[in-house]
């Protein structure tokens, strides 16, 4: 029996279209879930749990990722089913604002957990599948371009959503949130359709790729990849001490309107769009590790900037810095995983990476929710004390772990200062490397 020919070009086209609709959904679900929770009456601790519990259970679910792929019969079949389930759960969120019940926040949390678990199971399958299509030498440039393009859709989604909520202010915020999450559900259904049009390359099994989580952890001293995972988990823990609460600080403490909130989110997303291809080209040139070290240091400083001023114009600059820094972190970290792990081990290693990272995120969010209501005020606000603690922890993990792992492929040498000057355009490395 002849194996079906895999059309890589058509699969990448379908994946790109999936990314467009997924990005539209993400612009709503990732940036307006906390505003919805606050609208439904959530406390600071509940906001922390809304961020923490979905990520924890999503990460734990990834222990089952490899088994579920085998049980369903392939990565692609699993992806389609999970995406359609996600769309259905998002549709349920759309009706929550209309329900007259005391458990609306708890219902939102439960639905977000189900959505996150579906996403957690889908992550390793998608990462393994998409990297089968693209050679390692082109991944930085490709994902930089792809992320920038779908990021533009996320940006548009954030803007449209903010304008919708602002315009519904005199009508009904319940109707506004219903419209937003109903649109997100429809976009996710469309995303599932385009995933179903992709082809699945043959996936060869390797006995060496069958290793347990404990076997994975036990190789800390020998494994360069595991030391990277520990660094990433430390940075994630420190980041999520404060990350879920910036929206709370803006909407509850500073009393910003949804329009101002939207504008600040747009600044971050726009900076990320501009920076992604720059980081991608430099990652291909000097390696993902150098890009990750620089961008994670820049990201570590972000909470400290919130202590200086709360003027919206100033915070726009802070958000631009944040979007620039985090785009480098996410792109280089993902590409390092793809470079450091063989295709046969990729699903399992991505799953274990997400398990550890998800546990760190849960601990950070849960502890942040507790500390946010317990720490003494700093400059008049309790959450500013939490931001200061987060900054201190970010820098601490950076100094302890950023140099514990190394690049896995040949690259051009460059210092951190040379890389920074090149990324911002002062003294480009890319032009010199081609001379």
Roles of regions detected by a PLM:
Residues 1-9, 199-230, 411-435:
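Juxtamembrane intracellular "pre-TM" segments in multi-pass secondary transporters
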Residues 61-77, 165, 274-287, 372:
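Helix-to-loop junctions at the C-terminal end of transmembrane segments
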Residues 75-77, 165-185, 372-392:
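A membrane-interface helix-boundary motif in multi-pass transporters
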Residues 70-85, 145, 172-173, 284-296, ...:
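Cytoplasmic membrane-interface "Motif A"-like loop-to-helix N-cap segments
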Residues 120-134, 328-342:
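Intracellular juxtamembrane helix-capping segments at the cytosolic ends
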Residues 77-93, 185, 290-305, 391:
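Structural signature of the two symmetry-related core transmembrane helices
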Residues 95-112, 307-319:
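Helix-loop junctions at membrane interfaces in 12-TM secondary transporters
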Residues 1-60, 65, 69, 76-86, ...:
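Helix-loop boundary and gating motifs at the non-cytosolic
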